[in-house]
UniProtKB/Swiss-Prot annotation:
Organism: Scolopendra angulata
Family: Belongs to the scolopendra toxin 6 family.
Location(s), subcellular: Secreted
Keyword Secreted: yes
Protein name: Scolopendra 5971.33 Da toxin
Length: 18
């Protein structure tokens, strides 16, 4: 299930991805 995971590190934003 999706909660806040996609919001914390959106795939559309590589800058947020560690």
């Amino acid at each position: 299930e999706i909660t806040v995971e996609p919001v914390r590190h959106p795939k559309k934003d590589p800058s947020e991805a560690e």
